[in-house]
Amino acid sequence: MEEKSIFIEYFGDSPYMKVLNFLIGGQEFDYSMTEIARGAEVGWSAFTRVWAHLLEKDIIKQTRTIGNAKLFKLNKNNPFVKRLIKFDLELTKLETSKLNQKEISA
């Protein structure tokens, strides 16, 4: 069984959360839509519904075009995205701290 990220454990594995989780994890890189859908393990029809919302809310931005492929990444200038990244980091710290406490107690 594949281990879920802390983000997915807290917020569920809906297509929207899976795409956000993938983009947060790879926030320094840009990806094609196909790469994001595959990396997030989301079917294409569900992905396109999520994608429309991410574009509408300015959560993602196009970075460049290679051939016919448009590449995208998280829009880290968006205040919501900034908070989301910070929140993901805080969740990771919290869960790591809990895990360390369990190991010390054992």
Mark where each language-model region is.
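Short, cationic-aromatic polyanion-contact patches
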Residues: F7-Y16, S32, Q62-F87
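Short helix-capping/hinge SLiMs at alpha-helix to coil transitions
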Residues: I24-F29
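A short acidic, leucine-rich amphipathic alpha-helix
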Residues: E35-G39
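Helix-turn-helix DNA-binding helix
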Residues: F47-T48
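Short, hydrophobic-biased segments on the C-terminal half of alpha helices
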Residues: W51-A52
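Glycine-centered, phosphate/nucleic-acid-interacting loop/turn motifs that mediate DNA/RNA or nucleotide
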Residues: D58
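Amphipathic alpha-helical dimerization/coiled-coil segments
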Residues: P79-A106
